[in-house]
């Protein structure tokens, strides 16, 4: 087995940009900033670089160029958004630009294979934030000041590791660790390996990551498994955006890597279906549909929120959801997938009512269930019980009903309702025609990361 130092050196060669990469990226960045500067208005104070390019923490062959337009803080919110879009569209018009969404819309284009973002922010003093992007220039300055070349490479290793195990990105769909969080963790612990040691030993609570001494009042009021204090805004907890699943996966991946170092932890693994997984096919239900093209940020957020809503409806109908997922090709097709304990239920179910000494509640329970009850009795704990016939016993049929006649009341994001109503395809696990995006959902539901488990 190779030593951990050998593995880390090998991984660094995979993620550290070559001089030619730096030269190409810098050329595109400077030229694009020049285009943006042509179209600025008197209300624009400055045009600056931000993100991983500006901080020098970008990964080889995986980089965006973020250009921030600092707008005078006297501009109102509506004009702020309009100005940002206008400058972005005009400056990138030769590269088929499109709108992306965060707190405010911003404009993106791909130039010579490099994704370029033109993002508006207010020119404000530290702590006087008016938009979510206002902190970004301060983040950039902080990291450029505090990260040396060695730590920048350690950030690259951590980012590559997080990407490989699928927990990189603070968007709602991923619920993972942002690039900025990775930078903070390296500053806090000093190296990639030290971050893994720290994460592999976290406790059930009081997990605070703060470069400076944390404000006790703020920490007490933060509610998340990991509390990560933003060093330029101590009242902001970056850990709020990180899901329990992502934290858990990083903890287990860290333990596995430290126990048995492997370059595989820096390579994105395609999930494969193997023989043992196939026996779970009968427990799957997949809903696939086409949608009108929109920003990947929007569709992923809509899918995640809708997945939670549909899962809740399945649980309310007594279908135990073991695992769920949503996938998209980010072009036109998406799918919801559910692994259930069983796709069928017994025809009858017992409803247990109140204790007979709860006079009014007992009377109400009997009255409410009188017409649909097959039998009613008093059980050994002196509770009224009744046996009723289920409205549905098949998860596929239930999901079909949910996505047609009851779709308006399911909690599915309104932006997806029309897309689903136009046409959707339902598969159960024993269907042999599952392919495309639906197949990707199946892979996510019934496969395990062999590096960790």
How would you describe each model-predicted region?
Residues 110-166, 170, 182, 190, ...:
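Internal, well-ordered alpha/beta segment that forms a basic, Gly-enriched binding/recognition surface
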Residues 74-77, 95, 145-149:
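Short, polar/flexible loop-turn hinges at active-site or ligand-entry regions and domain interfaces
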Residues 1-60, 77-78, 106-108, 121-123:
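N-terminal regions immediately upstream of nucleotidyltransferase
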Residues 150, 155-331, 338-351:
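Conserved nucleotidyltransferase catalytic core and NTase-mimicking acidic/glycine-rich helix/loop elements
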Residues 50-88, 117-129, 332-346:
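Catalytic metal-binding acidic patch
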Residues 329-453:
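Extended, charged low-complexity segments
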Residues 8-27, 31, 35-38, 42, ...:
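Argonaute/PIWI-family RNA-guided endonuclease scaffold
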Residues 36, 82-129, 314, 322-334:
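Conserved catalytic core of two-metal-ion nucleotidyltransferases
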């Amino acid at each position: 087995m190779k030593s951990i130092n050998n593995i880390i050196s090998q991984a660094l060669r995979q993620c550290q940009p070559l001089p030619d990469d730096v030269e190409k990226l810098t050329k595109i960045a400077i030229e694009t900033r020049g285009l943006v500067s042509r179209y600025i208005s008197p209300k624009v104070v400055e045009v600056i670089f931000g993100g991983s390019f500006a901080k020098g923490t970008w990964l080889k062959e995986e980089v965006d160029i973020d250009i921030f337009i600092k707008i005078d803080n006297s501009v109102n919110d509506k004009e702020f958004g309009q100005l940002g879009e206008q400058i972005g569209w005009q400056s990138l018009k030769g590269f088929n630009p499109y709108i992306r969404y965060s707190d405010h819309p911003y404009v993106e284009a791909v130039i010579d294979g490099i994704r370029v973002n033109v993002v508006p922010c207010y020119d404000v003093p530290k702590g006087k934030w008016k938009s979510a992007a206002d902190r970004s220039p301060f983040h950039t300055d902080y990291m450029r000041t505090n990260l040396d070349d060695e730590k920048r490479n350690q950030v690259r290793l951590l980012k590559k590791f997080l990407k490989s195990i699928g927990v990189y990105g603070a968007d709602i769909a991923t619920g993972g660790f942002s690039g900025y969080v990775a930078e903070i963790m390296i500053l806090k612990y000093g190296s990639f390996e030290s971050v893994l040691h720290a994460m592999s030993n976290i406790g059930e609570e009081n997990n605070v990551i703060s470069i400076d001494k944390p404000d006790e009042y703020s920490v007490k009021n933060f509610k998340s498994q990991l509390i990560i204090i933003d060093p330029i805004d101590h009242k902001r907890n970056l850990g709020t955006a990180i899901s329990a699943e992502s934290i858990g996966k990083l903890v287990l991946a860290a333990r596995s890597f430290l126990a048995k170092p492997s370059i595989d932890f820096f390579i994105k693994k395609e999930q494969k279906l193997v023989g043992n997984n196939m026996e779970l096919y009968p427990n799957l239900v997949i809903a696939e549909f086409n949608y009108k093209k929109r920003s990947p940020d929007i569709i992923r957020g809509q899918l995640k929120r809708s997945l939670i809503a549909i899962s809740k409806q399945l649980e309310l109908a007594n279908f135990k959801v073991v695992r769920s997922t949503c996938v998209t090709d980010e072009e036109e097709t998406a799918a919801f997938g559910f692994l259930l304990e069983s796709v069928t239920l017994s025809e009858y179910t017992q409803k247990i009512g109140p204790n007979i000494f709860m006079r009014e509640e007992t009377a109400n329970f009997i009255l409410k269930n009188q017409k649909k009850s097959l039998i009613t009795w008093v059980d050994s704990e002196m509770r009224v019980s009744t046996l009723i016939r289920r409205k549905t016993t098949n998860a596929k049929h239930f999901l079909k009903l949910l996505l047609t006649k009851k779709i308006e009341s399911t909690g599915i994001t309104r932006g997806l309702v029309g897309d689903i109503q136009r046409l959707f395809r339902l598969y159960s696990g024993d269907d042999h025609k599952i392919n495309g995006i639906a197949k990707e959902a199946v892979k996510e539901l019934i496969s395990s990361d062999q590096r960790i488990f």
